[in-house]
Amino acid sequence: VSVQTVDAGGRSQSMTSAPVAPHGPALQSALRLVQVDHARLAALLGGASGAGGESGAAAFERAFPGAIGAACIGAAGIGAACVGAACTGAAAHGPLLADAVPDLPLAPVHMKRLVPQHSAGAPQATPGAGHDASCYEIWQCAADDLRSVRRGALHYRYSEAAGLVFGSIVLNEADFAAQPATHAQAPLERATDAAYRMLFDLLDGLDMPHPLRIWNTVPAINLEQHGAERYRQFNAGRQRAFEACRRTLTGSVPAACALGSVGPLSAQGVPGEPLAVYFLASRTSADAIENPRQVSAFHYPAQYGARAPTFARAAAWSGAAGACTAPVLFISGTASIVGHRTVHHGDVLAQTRETLANLAAVLDQAARQGHGPFALADLTFKVYVRDGADAAMLAAIDSQLREAAGPHVRALYLHADVCRSDLLIEIEASAGHAVASLA
């Protein structure tokens, strides 16, 4: 297995035929992120069983010691069913990892991966043409006391020693559509409320009360249903759970994103894909970071919905108490917004430039708060693009990102709907943790 790694300080390293271990001098942080293609992971797990009878779980543990959770990203056409951690369907790839390592929380991300045509080392395929470019993101921590628990729709793994938990919650809206409506809540609002109550109940029970980063996949996020846009329904359900669980709605809130999976609706208007929420949380709190170029999301005016989004622009986490580790920076989904207004309507490249300016502003603010300094070149990016069929546009976005962050930029591109219908691109990022890519 050929592995390209970057340490927590952003320095490139090379590892060949070696496990992606979270220990040793390369890891200056409590976390490591590994991005691995589906084909490479299948070869790693399958090859192990054929060469000496090693089980898939043993092969996975040897290659990814300290794995605390994973996301299955970009499997095109994952459709109707996703129960717990296992995705099903003709094109679903979740079972590869779910079957081999059933104890590992696995979050489904129902978004097609896009590959810019000129990316060095990437498959030269046209985005949207149906090629299989699915992959996994695996989070590792430096812990050997990991414990896994499955509780209905919630699957989580945690370490008492590291004070960390990774969890995945997958809920089908159809289950909430069948329930009697209360306070005129739409099924998505009720599902979101339920998901976040599960999340907060878990964190309080583990005495790891601080969510660091939350990822939300919301089907048909821009669709108007039940008298309101579905993103606004999601925000209402999320904030309702924050209030019910006595969580602050402003200031010290987690980094987060909410992106829309692109899929069909049933005849009853219910998405065929689930609401999926996955998260990293800790016993120690993170430092919330805002962007001086933007109004804080939790202070957005009512024109964006009766309930404001509940997230910080970024969160900087320094690890377990007394660990003396470098800060990990989680940057929320960031877009072409100045103040609270969308700018550069209809121009995706101008929106990309504005988004990069916002990311740079977040890094500057993080440095002012004592975290970093980080540069754009230090970041690992995830880029969500609304138009997944325009190969030339995707290549131009990739060129802009490389111009801003350097030729060796680490970026994963996904086809997704963005939370505002006039936003054409959203970029999230992280830094301060080691990164490895297996392709």
Placement of each model-derived feature along the sequence:
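N-terminal presequence-like segments and the immediate start of the first folded domain
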Residues: S2-A439
